[in-house]
Amino acid sequence: MNSPRISQPGEDRGAPPLRRRTFMMTTAAGAGMAAARSAAAEDSAPDVDSPSQGTQPTQLTVNGTHHALKLQPRTSLLDLLREQLGLTGAKKGCDHGQCGACTVHVDGRRVASCLTLAVKTDGCAVTTIEGIESADGTLHPMQQAFIDHDALQCGYCTPGQVMAAIACVREGHATSDAQIREYMSGNLCRCGAYAGILEAIREAAPVMRRLEGRRHA
C-alpha cells in the first residue's frame, strides 16, 4: 500500500506528489553523503601529532658531545636536554621564561632553554650544569662557592642560578653587589637564599677571572 501523501501549505498542485517514504529515503541518502565527505576530510588532514611529521635535521654539541638529531620544530631546548638526552640538571620551573631554573649557555651566552627552540641551536655549542666541572671531576669555582656559602636550600633553582652566575661574571656584571643583584634578577629562589647567592658570586668572581685569564693567556 502506498504511503500517505504529505501535503505542504501553498504547494503547487501540479508538482509531483511528495510521499513520506520518498522524503525519508532522500533525507537518509543526504546524511550518508555528508558523513562520507566528513570522513574523507579527516583522512586527508595532516597528523600534526605524529612524531615523524615535519622533523628537521639538527646538529649541536652539548657539553662537548656532538649530536645529530631529527627534531620537531616545536621542541624546546629544555625538553630536548631533559627528555631526549637525559640531562636533567636544567629544571622546568615556570616553562614561560620567568624563573630562570632552566638557564643554560648557548655559545657562551645564557638563555632560558624553555623558550629556546632546539632547532635554533643547530651548529651551536650548548653547556649545561652537567658540563661545567673540570675533566678530573673538580667542581667549578662557582659551584664550590655556592656550597661554601649555603647559597641553596631545596636546590631546585640551583643549576639555573649557577649557570646564570657564571654568565654574570663573564659578562663583566659582577663588579658590585648592586650590579650582581640586577643581573641575577631573572633567576628566582623561592627559598630566599639570595644573601648566600650574592656572597658566592662575590667570592667566585675573582677566582674565575684568574683561572680564565690564565687559560686565555
Describe every region a protein language model picked out.
Residues N2-A217:
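Signature of N-terminal electron-transfer/Fe-S-associated modules in redox systems
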